[in-house]
Amino acid sequence: MQGRSLLFAILRIAVATSLLGVAQFCAGQFIPASPPIADPNDKRFDAESEDWSSPALDKSHLTPVPPLSSGIAVKSNCSVEMVRLQWRFGDPIDVYVMKPKGVEKPPVVLYLFGHTADTDLFRDEHFEQGSTRDGFAAVGFVSALAGPRFHDRPITQWFVSELPESLATSAHDVQMILDYLAKRGDLDMTRVGMFAQDSGASVAILAAAVDPRIKVLDVIDPWGDWPDWLAHSPVVPDGERPRYTTPEFLNKLTGLDPMSWLPKVQGKVRVQNALFVPGTPPEAREKLLAAVPAGGTVVVYKTPTDTQEILQNNQILQWIHQGLAQLPPSDIAKLPSLPAAGKKAGALRP
């Protein structure tokens, strides 16, 4: 039942992000901006610089301040710790670290969902139990300009209006979070996976392409092929679309297109695509699927019914867990053996 609840939560996010994103943004025009978080007297990040033209960190200079922990909550089969990380002025990031009981240095999966996602999911008991089942750790956080990370800026700004910033900083965050996790010393950082959806899937592709520490990548409905996506995606309000299809705006995205970076991912890759979720235009969707590197897996769900197999058999995380379990472990306790993955609905590639 835990796996089923986990799948419902993930699919709910996928559908809500694509179908309700515009409605939520429009409604947001009438909601007062959140209170300021950034302290103008905070000089800790004055020397930092960041390159928004690339997902790579080689031209950026980000130095983290000491992490702040909320303490560890011990649950029935896992522990949960919220850690606040920061390496950018006015942008603290709440990272949820969920660890299974009884496993020393477990492999870890990072979770990043769409631009309307909040951190509530990472405090959900079903998610905590389902994501740590089978001896895997889970690390959840949200993208730039999402959830608690939207503050100190005009309410008319959002993930897409600031797309170069949103993509680049979020991809940088993934790498900085991996650095933090490596310093903890309680996770197997030789076996790292990332599970992401929608805009989060785009960020995950960018990060995995430049950071080989991500050994297994499982993404659902990634955005990409920016000229076509911005021109035709229903996520973009028609009244704003002309702003995002100008050469000036598109030029800023040249080095941030998941379609270009996906073939460069070195780890194991699976791209899942739900045709009934309309966030990505058909032509852009096809180009993204065609960009999956050789040996990668593509799964297409034509209707919600096609998801019943993974729903009934609790397989939503089985593929990424198996991929990590097949990698040689570092100095960790042996994981329980996992069942063979079931037949993938609508699989186009082995």
Task: Indicate where each model-derived feature is located.
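N-terminal cap/lid segment of alpha/beta-hydrolase-fold proteins
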Residues: 59-103
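Cap/lid segment of the alpha/beta-hydrolase catalytic domain
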Residues: 114-172, 229-232
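Short beta-strand element of the alpha/beta-hydrolase
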Residues: 95, 105-114
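The feature captures the conserved acid-bearing segment of alpha/beta-hydrolase catalytic domains
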Residues: 234, 238-286, 290
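Alpha/beta-hydrolase
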Residues: 110-112, 141-143, 220, 301
